UniProtKB/Swiss-Prot annotation:
It is an enzyme of class 3 (hydrolase). InterPro entries: Inosine/uridine_hydrolase_dom, IUNH, Nucleosid_hydro_RihC_nonspecif, Ribo_hydro-like. The lineage of its organism: Bacteria, Pseudomonadati, Pseudomonadota, Gammaproteobacteria, Enterobacterales. The keyword Hydrolase applies. Hydrolyzes both purine and pyrimidine ribonucleosides with a broad-substrate specificity. Belongs to the IUNH family. RihC subfamily. HAMAP family: Nucleosid_hydro_RihC. It comes from the Bacteria. The keyword Transcription does not apply. This is Non-specific ribonucleoside hydrolase RihC. It comes from Klebsiella pneumoniae (strain 342). PANTHER family: INOSINE-URIDINE PREFERRING NUCLEOSIDE HYDROLASE, NON-SPECIFIC RIBONUCLEOSIDE HYDROLASE RIHC. Transmembrane segments: none annotated. One of its GO terms (cellular component) is cytosol.
């Protein structure tokens, strides 16, 4: 039986690979996509998500979400993904439109009408998830778990200590980690090692149409290089859902710093239990890199 999921995303080049996996991994059933401002503005992430759904002729509804973090100005990652968020490939024109309701409302409606709890997957800033929990706190009972790409038990990639998705909206992340949801955190401890190797990247144009498209996008992705390998941060969250055996997880208490002058957005991951707080997340601390690479190649080969 396929696992029903809702994907909250901010495409984003590595998001495109994650969306492909969410659509074509045989273990998963993508029921709804929502967008959030993050890698680029929400108008651009929505356009990019619609382009991808049209590219794959995917019958998945999409709702546009938050245009700004809860209390802070938006700082994007156009320097990594390009000004459009998905530089490098010319998608064909289409007439697709997002749903006429905001993302948190669309998620709430999908949860409340589902026959069983649904897994949420958030691979961008957590603004939409925080809004959902604020507006509809009763929804926690309809969420099986929340799998996020975000955070780090060590160094950051946006500031010295903070990972991008958490740093963009620390207040949203703090609310989510204190929500009581079952959370799986796939952070930089594993995603920095989740490389697609150069020899595999070179084969993508001959694989299928998806391979051609991803190769064109990856050529403009500034998280690694085509010659040394590219980090697939967002793909890790989907990989854990499809093949959890690839990851080593540890229950930890995770707090999000919201006040620090230099440390805002840092995830304080209490690996050794020094704070005496109960664990509120399962934190991925290790990954089978070769197994991840095999899985990624297999799932991309399943796409058209």
């Amino acid at each position: 039986m396929r696992l029903p999921i809702i994907l909250d995303t901010d495409p984003g080049i590595d998001d495109a690979a994650a969306i492909a996996a969410a659509l074509f991994a045989p273990e998963l059933e993508l029921q709804l996509m929502t967008t959030v401002a993050g890698n680029v503005s929400v108008e651009k992430t929505t356009r990019n998500a619609l382009q991808l759904l049209h590219f794959w002729n995917a019958d998945v509804p999409l709702a546009q979400g938050a245009s700004m973090p809860l209390v802070r100005p938006l700082r994007d990652a156009a320097s990594v993904h390009g000004e459009s968020g998905m530089e490098g490939y010319d998608f064909v024109e289409h007439q697709r439109q997002p749903l006429a309701k905001p993302a948190f409302q669309a998620i709430r409606d999908a949860l409340m009408h589902a026959a069983e709890p649904i897994t949420l997957v958030a691979i961008g800033p957590l603004t939409n998830i925080a809004l959902l929990l604020t507006q509809y706190p009763e929804c926690v009972f309809n969420i099986r778990r929340l799998v996020i790409m975000g955070g780090s038990a060590g160094r950051g990639n946006f500031t010295p200590n903070a990972e991008f998705n958490i740093a963009i909206d620390p207040e949203a992340a703090a609310k989510v980690f204190h929500s009581g949801l079952e959370i799986v955190m796939c952070g930089l401890d594993v995603t920095n090692r989740a490389l697609l190797a150069a020899d595999y990247l070179a084969t993508l144009p001959t694989l299928n149409q998806t391979g051609k498209m991803l190769h064109a996008l990856f050529s403009h992705y500034r998280s690694g290089s085509m010659s040394s390998g590219l980090r697939m941060h967002d793909l890790c969250a989907i990989a854990w859902l499809a093949c959890p055996e690839l990851f080593t997880l540890q229950p930890c208490f995770v707090a999000v710093e919201t006040q620090g002058t230099w440390t805002a957005g840092t995830t304080v991951v209490d690996i050794e239990g020094r704070l005496g707080q109960p664990a509120n997340a399962l934190v991925a601390l290790d990954i089978d890199v070769e197994g991840f690479q095999r899985w990624a190649a297999e799932v991309i080969a399943l796409a058209p």
